[in-house]
Amino acid sequence: MQIRPIEPGDNEALAKVIRTALAEFGANKPGTVYFDPTTDALYELFRTPGSFYYVATIDEVIVGGCGIFPTENLPQGTCELVKLYLAKEARGTGLGKQLMEISLSWAKENGYTKVYLESMPELAKAVSIYEKVGFKALDHPLGNSGHCGCDIWMLKEL
């Protein structure tokens, strides 16, 4: 297992991991990253200042990723934990938690004081992991992610 920064050639494989995972959980619906055109151009998206994306590989095959993004209209000092998805074979290995911890560390090292995320009931297992690492439920969304299909919003202080 290796975790590394996103590279220009990663877009297609990452989009496939993300969309396959969403479909497996029945979360491939409008208003989610499944239909978000930026899912096909993650390398370009994560060239945005204040953002970073980590890619996980097993035997040089991309099996997931996770990132930090300065989503529009979030409160001062807040970033969003985004696009944490794993291929089926990488789930249950601790890799998701590792990706999340590395991303949260990057956020803190880069001056963020809070991390926001959006999810949905179909991804209940992920939501329970977020709670275990200190994310707290909110009763409304923050910022403007454009993902109206997400109705679980959480925030963590770093």
Predicted stretch roles:
Residues T20, T113-Y116, M120-L158:
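C-terminal "cap" of GNAT-fold acetyltransferases
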Residues Q98-K114:
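Conserved acyl-CoA
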Residues T20, E24, G92, S105-E109, ...:
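Conserved amphipathic alpha-helical interaction elements at protein-protein interfaces in regulatory
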